[in-house]
Swiss-Prot record:
The lineage of its organism: Bacteria, Pseudomonadati, Pseudomonadota, Gammaproteobacteria, Pseudomonadales. NCBIfam families: PRK01231.1. NAD(+) binds at D72, G73, N146, D147, R157, K174, D176, T187, A188, Y189, A190, L191, S192, Q247. It comes from Pseudomonas putida (strain W619). The gene is nadK. Gene3D superfamilies: Probable inorganic polyphosphate/atp-NAD kinase, domain 1, Probable inorganic polyphosphate/atp-NAD kinase, domain 2. The active site is at D72. One of its GO terms (biological process) is NAD metabolic process. The keyword NAD applies. Its cofactor is a divalent metal cation. Its main location: cytoplasm. This is NAD kinase.
Length: 296
């Protein structure tokens, strides 16, 4: 296992709990004589930190490990920035759900120490890359660890579009939108829209229509190496949006084409030993426990 010496810290802004956890984490790492680097935006609200600072982009070039303190949204943003650097990312949960940031604050020292001692698991999570083209010219590009979503924006009108997979026509639809999700994102927005839960190790993409105006519109799971093309109807009277992880947004025009495919670089997500995906699903999604209350 890799030995981590240069540790970057990214935190969610606007939370006193996040700042308290970062102070604890900083103290713990320095006591282990490690080189700690703070993301510059969080350093600005942490006076007297006395640490080297760096932009998020450069953290991937100078660190062996980046620790994200926040919720899943914080880790999604970090993943898009750091995947290209092939750097491991570890999450400490200071958000609501915590599907990706799976270390609780009360176990910070114990779990982080185990990771630093080489006791951890690595999951390679793939991302999607999306491009919006107008008259054969790219007008917007973005990456997503969870999902790429076509939606009507501020309008309440439905969107008409066609779907192609690897150049083959699949169907035309009239719906509130379309979700294209990774296995990581299958437990996010796609789940709310009726999509299946996919294990993170699957090399697959799920396409989930949002409230389609038909009884036959159903999610479809395709090979992870597929290239998807979504063509917005030229007769559409609204300007829908494309969102990547709900954080990056692009406005489409009638006739635009959205292509979605797997990004070559993957996120290296670190988990402490003993991480169990099904236990996470039980805890976060409220799945039933064993009959009779057994928890062995």
């Amino acid at each position: 296992m890799e030995q981590f010496r240069n540790i970057g810290i990214i935190g969610r802004l606007g939370s006193s709990q996040v700042l308290d956890t970062i102070r604890r984490l900083k103290k713990f790492l320095l006591e282990r004589h490690l080189h700690v680097i703070l993301e510059d935006t969080i350093a600005e609200v942490l006076p007297g930190h006395g640490l080297q600072t760096s932009t998020r982009k450069l953290l991937g070039e100078v660190c062996d490990l980046v620790i994200v303190v926040g919720g899943d949204g914080s880790l999604l943003g970090a993943a898009r920035a750091l995947a290209r650097h092939n750097i491991p990312v570890l999450g400490i949960n200071r958000g609501n759900l915590g599907f990706l940031t799976d270390i609780r604050p009360d176990e910070l020292e114990e779990k982080v120490a185990a990771v630093l001692d080489g006791h951890y698991l690595v999951e390679n999570r793939f991302l999607l890359q999306a491009e919006v083209r107008r008259h054969h010219e790219a007008i917007g590009q973005g990456d997503a660890l969870n999902d790429v979503v076509l939606h009507p924006g501020k309008s309440t009108r439905m969107i008409e579009f066609e779907i192609y997979i690897d150049g083959q026509f699949v169907c035309s639809q009239k719906a509130d939108g379309l979700i294209v999700a990774t296995p990581t994102g299958s437990t996010a927005y796609a789940l709310s829209a009726g999509g299946p839960i996919m294990h993170p190790k699957l090399d697959a993409i799920v396409i989930v229509p949002m409230y389609p105006h038909t009884l036959s519109g159903r999610p479809i799971v395709v090979d992870g190496n597929s290239e998807l093309k979504i063509v917005v109807s030229k007769d559409l009277q609204i300007y829908p949006q494309v969102s990547c992880d709900g954080q990056n947004h692009f406005t489409c025009a009638p006739g635009d084409t959205i292509t979605v495919s797997k990004k070559p670089q993957k996120l290296r997500l670190i988990h402490p030993l003993g991480h169990n995906y099904y236990e996470v699903c039980r805890t976060k999604l409220g799945w039933g426990s064993r009959l009779g209350g057994r928890d062995d």
